[in-house]
């Protein structure tokens, strides 16, 4: 992986996003480059990738810009996304991303069996109001033999939560998002590492890996949190159970 080249390409894509969204997406570039490295490692150009629940982020369009054939599945109904969805999805389409608008918790994935090299879902399953089990099994069924599944989620027992919850601070969602909106789309249940390993066993994945990172701290509004993240991140990577963001990478048997 040429990290500098990838970073430059993803930053150029972020600059094409409308208005303030460009700044928001630019802050996400390090996370997106890391996610791309998990998904694309060792793949030849032209490999097929599906991203489930990727929304308007840079992952799918970034993978397409790097030469992959990409399908993005999402309902795009997050409140803040609706006014800008069409403009951003046009950027995706120009680079060849196939857009499949659907709520995967209610509608089955419309994938042919054994048709994808990699399927990913980042920061999505914790929002689902139905069990993710059925959809995850559909993802594995759509992978080619030896295909890669990558799941990224927030860690419900990361170090920050272990420190702040005893102090009475640790709400997952704002009152406005939970109480005032017609449909709650926040976090329903955040997993931990034991949950990811449970999923891996249920899906019969092989060669599984668990990784940890701490992306949220880098873009926190709190300067002390940003500084603490910079100082602690390299150490915490060795202890994924304490990290804010955890990943499962596994392969279809």
Where are these regions (language model features)?
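S-adenosyl-L-methionine-dependent methyltransferase catalytic module, highlighting the catalytic core
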Residues: 3-30, 54, 75, 80-82, ...
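Conserved alpha-helix/loop element of class I SAM-dependent methyltransferases that forms part
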Residues: 27-46
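Conserved class I S-adenosyl-L-methionine
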Residues: 46-55
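Conserved SAM-binding loop of SAM-dependent methyltransferases across substrates and taxa
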Residues: 56-68
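Conserved SAM-binding motif I beta-strand of class I
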Residues: 69-75
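Hydrophobic/aromatic anchor residues within beta-strands of the central parallel beta-sheet
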Residues: 70, 99-101
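A short acidic, Gly/Pro-enriched loop at the edge of an enzyme's catalytic core
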Residues: 109-119
């Amino acid at each position: 992986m040429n990290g500098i080249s990838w970073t430059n390409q993803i930053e150029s894509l972020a600059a094409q996003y409308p208005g303030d969204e460009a700044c928001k997406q630019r802050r996400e570039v390090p996370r997106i480059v890391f996610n791309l490295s998990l998904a694309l490692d060792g793949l030849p150009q032209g490999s097929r990738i599906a991203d489930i629940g990727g929304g308007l982020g840079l992952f799918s369009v970034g993978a397409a810009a790097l030469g992959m054939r990409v399908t993005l599945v999402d309902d795009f109904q997050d409140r803040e996304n609706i006014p800008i969805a069409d403009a951003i999805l046009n950027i995706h389409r120009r680079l060849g991303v196939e857009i499949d608008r659907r709520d995967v918790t209610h509608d089955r994935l419309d994938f042919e069996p054994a048709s994808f090299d990699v399927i990913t879902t980042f920061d999505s399953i914790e929002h689902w109001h139905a069990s993710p089990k059925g959809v995850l099994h559909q993802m594995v069924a759509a992978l080619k033999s030896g295909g890669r599944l990558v799941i990224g989620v927030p860690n419900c027992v990361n170090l920050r939560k272990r420190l702040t919850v005893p102090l009475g601070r640790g709400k997952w969602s704002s009152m406005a998002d939970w109480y005032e909106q017609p449909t709650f789309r926040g976090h329903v249940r955040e997993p931990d590492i034991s949950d990811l390993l449970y999923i891996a066993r249920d899906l019969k994945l092989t060669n599984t890996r668990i990784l940890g990172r701490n992306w949220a701290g880098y873009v926190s509004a709190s300067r002390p949190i940003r500084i603490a993240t910079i100082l602690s991140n390299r150490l915490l990577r060795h202890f994924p159970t304490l990290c804010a963001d955890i990943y499962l990478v596994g392969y279809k048997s």
